[in-house]
Each structure stands twice: as structure tokens, then as C-alpha cells.
Regions:
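Nucleotidyltransferase catalytic core that binds NTPs
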Residues: 1-183
Length: 183
């Protein structure tokens, strides 16, 4: 079952950075790199979601996967399609499977602080919150008040704020496509 899945050994510390990455951008890379350095992780796995259950639609998977590969630099950053390979749509399913597939590996879930607003909408969010340590990396527009509802045992990493967002990138792309071409 581990064939074509990322390599990890007992004792390793792996950050799990899941997302739609629609598209991936420098802000995503900043979150992953901050967690890698500040948490002393051996690797960060970018888990490209087949389809975010909280979003109506996403760009094609291959396009999003490639955009993540273009942002994840260095040998310690691993972009993977393991959720698609395993057929999972929800984080709790992924965490259950990874704990069985990789005994002795210490996983930490990484997310930008902007994801806190929707965390309680995740399927089995309580299970996710208790399954592994969760590291929250600061993001623009998310102040300390947003963190108040999050469990105290989570790890909060304040870092330089990176203003780019996938939503803004998609909006600019749509606007550029909608502009009439001059002859």
C-alpha cells in the first residue's frame, strides 16, 4: 500500500500541509517554510486535495498539483497526491491512514491562520484537533481574536506576513480573461 507514497521512517517529524492550492503561491511556500524551520521538521508534505469539500469547485487537479510543485522548493518539501491515491476527501481520514501506514512517525498538521474560520466546519474536526499537533502560521487579516476559539494546545507561529492569496490570484486571472482584446 505504501508504493508511490512519500518515504518516511519511524522517528521522523513530518509536517502535513494540506490544501486546494488553487493555485499555490508564495504565501503557501512561506507557511510551509516557516513551519519546517520553526518546528524542526524533517519534511513538509504538501497534500494536494482532490477536492476541498468546503468549496464548490476547483481547478483541475493536475494544474493545482503542478502549481504546488512550482512553489515547494528544496529536498525537505514533498508535494504528494496521497489523498487522491487513497481516495480520501477529509483530513480525519488522511490522518487515520497515515498513522497506520507510518507507525512511529510524528505528524504535525500545518495550516495558515486564515483556515481557522472554517475549521469547525471540517468533517470530524474534533478528531482532527486531537489526532496530531496542529501548527497555525499567521496570515494577513487574521488577528489574535480568531485564535481564541482554537484549542490551547495548538502551536501558534507568528511570522512575517505574506499578502498573496489564491482567491486574489484567481480574481486577477478571471479579470484578465474577461478584458476585451484590442485589435
Amino acid at each position: 500500500m505504501k508504493r508511490d507514497l512519500p518515504l518516511a521512517y519511524p522517528g521522523m517529524k513530518i509536517g502535513l500541509f494540506g490544501g486546494s492550492f488553487d493555485p499555490a503561491h508564495q504565501g503557501h511556500a512561506h507557511v510551509a517554510e516557516t513551519a519546517l524551520k520553526r518546528l524542526g521538521l524533517d519534511r513538509v508534505w504538501w497534500l494536494v486535495s482532490p477536492q476541498n469539500p468546503l468549496k464548490a469547485k476547483s481547478s483541475p487537479f493536475a494544474e493545482r498539483f503542478l502549481s504546488a510543485q512550482n512553489q515547494a522548493h528544496g529536498a525537505k518539501m514533498v508535494v504528494t497526491d496521497l489523498e487522491q491515491r487513497l481516495g480520501f476527501a477529509f483530513t480525519y481520514q488522511t490522518l487515520r491512514a497515515l498513522k497506520q501506514l507510518y507507525p512511529g512517525v510524528a505528524f504535525t498538521l500545518i495550516m495558515g491562520a486564515d483556515n481557522l474560520a472554517n475549521f469547525r466546519k471540517w468533517r470530524n474536526w474534533r478528531e482532527v484537533a486531537e489526532a496530531v499537533p496542529v501548527a497555525i502560521v499567521s496570515r494577513p487579516g487574521v488577528g489574535a481574536s480568531k485564535r481564541l476559539g482554537a484549542p490551547r494546545h495548538w502551536i501558534y507561529l507568528n511570522a512575517r506576513l505574506h499578502r498573496e492569496s489564491s482567491t486574489a490570484i484567481r480574481s486577477r486571472k478571471r479579470a484578465a480573461l474577461a478584458k476585451p482584446k484590442r485589435k
